[in-house]
């Protein structure tokens, strides 16, 4: 598995991942618009050239709001979500982000565990 900053060509795969993982997914267009804005930061996890997970944040001054963490159902329970979160925080720290937030639903045990 390789975790890296998201590349523009990965956006269609990330949009497909959103469709699988969320009841109110980001659209491909929404992802493209956010990707183009400097206050957004995204990382992806890939296996054999396929995106199996991604995470994103929105930066305001020195704070980062983690917007999404998604992992394909078939790739879950392998630590990918945790690895994505760590990579996102490390990339955020490179941008002088010093505080990170992540809102989770009460029943989302996987997100709470991160």
Regions found by a protein language model. Give the residues of each.
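Acetyl-CoA-dependent GNAT
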Residues: 2-74, 78, 82-95
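Conserved catalytic-core motifs of GNAT/GCN5-like acyltransferases
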Residues: 29, 103, 112
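Conserved hydrophobic beta-strand within the GNAT/NAT acetyltransferase core sheet
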Residues: 66, 99-104
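Short amphipathic helical patch at the helix-1/turn junction of helix-turn-helix
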Residues: 71, 105-106
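Conserved active-site alpha-helix within GNAT-family acetyltransferase domains
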Residues: 82, 98, 107-114
């Amino acid at each position: 598995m390789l975790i890296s900053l998201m590349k523009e060509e990965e956006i269609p795969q990330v949009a497909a991942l959103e469709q699988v993982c969320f009841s109110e997914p980001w659209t491909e267009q929404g992802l493209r618009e956010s990707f183009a804005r400097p206050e957004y930061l995204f990382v992806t996890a890939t296996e054999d050239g396929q995106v199996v997970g991604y995470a994103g944040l929105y930066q305001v001054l020195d704070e980062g709001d983690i917007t999404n963490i998604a992992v394909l159902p078939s790739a879950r329970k392998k630590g990918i979500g945790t690895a994505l979160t760590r990579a996102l925080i490390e990339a955020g720290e490179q941008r002088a982000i010093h505080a990170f937030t992540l809102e989770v639903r009460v029943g989302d045990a996987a997100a709470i565990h991160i």
